[in-house]
Amino acid sequence: MNRNCIKFLLIFLFFSFSTKAQEKFSNPIIPGGYPDPSICKVGDTFYIVNSSFEYFPGLPIHKSKDLINWELIGYGLHRKSQVNSTVNLIDVQSNGGIHAPTIRHKDGIYYIITTNVYYDEEREKADMVNFIITAKNPAGPWSDPIHIQGAPGIDPDLFFDDDGRVWYVGNQMPENPNFEGEGEIWLQELDINEFKLIGGKHL
């Protein structure tokens, strides 16, 4: 009886250590500068996109099956024609550029929605352009940026509701802030075919 218990214990310890050895991974999982991650899962694959600020190509996209091993598969902004008009990365400042993207998938289409920040030094003001790009393959090619007119603030997100409607969710500065840097969350329905805000805004 004792011999069987010892055998069982040894087998248990062997598999425990083997499992722990397989669970080891490096931190950070994706080394380098990949802040503000947004992730979505399609089938058995995870896709992640990050801020890229003033760098081009921009919006790096990685994929993974296990959330540990990641492969860079492309960039949302990969053509110069994407960044010289609505989105300006030609002479953008080092504290501007692409901030806090969101990646989503619906009905075979991938969406990235994000903010381009451009500081106008003459006016001492930051211009913020919220825009969407789309692709049928997350590795690209991605569409030209589509400016979401009437969408103030930063950190945009997309919510696909069960009733078929799509909502734009954003963060903006309130009209009468209680403290410096205060933000408020707002949402508004988005026509996902025309990429236009419709209906009223909800705070």
What would you call each of these model-derived segments?
Residues 1-23:
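Bacterial Sec-dependent N-terminal signal peptides
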Residues 21-203:
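Carbohydrate-active catalytic/glycan-binding domains of CAZyme proteins
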